[in-house]
Regions:
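Hydrophobic helical membrane-anchoring modules
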Residues: 138, 175-311
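Structured catalytic core of nucleotide-sugar glycosyltransferases
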Residues: 1-126
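Acceptor/aglycone-binding surface of glycosyltransferases and processive sugar-polymer synthases
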Residues: 63-67, 71-81, 95-179, 195-214
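Short conserved micro-motifs on helix faces and helix-strand junctions that flank
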Residues: 7, 65-67, 90, 156, ...
Length: 311
């Protein structure tokens, strides 16, 4: 059986058309299927629509989280409740066409543990977003010990072995595509063209993307801490030679003129480096603090899934 996890946040406008498209593609496969909606604190009527859809089809389930926990945690909740031996992660905004699932399932049948969808074309995305996304993936692959495929999102199919391994990763700052890459196992790609949204506006603002990028970097790399250390060594190196130059100018050249400019430049430069280092360390400490609290990753407000079905 394949479980299809759909994270939902304010998708009322385009959800019905996406579900129709998904249902059509499911009729073309021999796999038994369950569809799991994860309502991540939607402020529109998404939950009402989800409940109506679930009433009309016994294979459609829903999880209503107690508040908005974020896309990555919503997907994690869906994985936790999924019963299938294969789990497909896909957004419901229509940008990732459900028809690609047939190619992905064919690859799974070849023995792969993970099949991820790799974009060869992105519709309705600005040049800035495409450029920053490409730069980010290349940068992330440079500073981490794992390789996260470029031009991929969370659209993929994983098997039960991978899903169970993900459940053993308790960190609160989730970056699923990085976590799945870290797990290893046998992975491959299927190429596809990403479409424009079928309705509404994206919930992934630049602020949320920056937060996701920070989670990715701090979860898989110590590079920011090393940068702070190297900056400290660099400043100490420069400071040492400035001291030597000051002594040389004062006692050898007799050209030493006391003044505020050099002092202020030095203070501002060193202060900026110190604040940068403190900020980087603070990001890691904040994440340690979140994890040692040992709070649940999410809370379920209501669901039509049998509690015994989840792990």
């Amino acid at each position: 059986m394949i479980s299809i996890v759909l994270p939902i946040y304010n998708e009322e406008a385009g959800l019905a058309s996406f579900v129709s498209e998904l249902s059509l593609e499911l009729t073309k496969t021999s796999e038994n299927a369950e569809v799991i909606f994860v309502n991540d604190g939607s402020k529109d009527n998404s939950l009402t629509l989800i409940k109506k859809i679930c009433e009309e089809n016994k294979d459609f389930k829903y999880i209503d989280l107690s508040r908005n926990f974020g896309h990555q945690i919503a997907v994690s909740a869906g994985i936790d409740f999924a019963k299938g031996d294969k789990i497909m992660l896909i957004d419901s905004d229509g940008q990732d066409p459900p028809a690609v699932m047939h190619q992905m399932l064919a690859k799974m049948d070849e023995g792969y543990d993970v099949v991820y969808a790799q974009r060869i074309k992105r519709a309705d995305e600005s040049a800035l977003k495409k450029l920053t996304a490409k730069f980010f993936y290349k940068f992330l692959n440079k500073i981490t010990s794992i390789e996260i495929p470029v031009d991929t999102g969370d659209f993929r199919i994983i098997n039960r072995k991978v899903a169970n391994a993900l459940k053993q990763m308790p960190e609160k700052q989730r970056y699923l595509r990085g976590q799945i890459a870290w797990l290893g196992f046998k992975q491959t790609a299927v190429s596809y063209e990403r479409l424009g949204r079928n309705a509404g506006e994206t919930g992934y603002t630049y602020r949320k993307m920056i937060r996701l990028a920070l989670d990715a970097i701090t979860s898989f790399s110590n590079w920011p801490l090393r940068l702070a250390t190297l900056s400290g060594f660099f400043c100490a190196f420069i400071g040492f030679f400035l001291i030597l130059y000051t002594l040389y100018a004062r006692f050898i050249l007799k050209q030493y003129e006391p003044g505020w400019p050099s002092l202020m430049i030095t203070i501002i430069f060193l202060g900026g480096i110190q604040l940068l280092g403190i900020g980087m360390i603070g990001e890691y400490i904040s994440r340690i603090n979140d994890n040692v609290k040992n709070r649940p990753l999410y809370l379920v407000g209501e669901t039509n899934i049998d509690p015994d079905a989840s792990n």
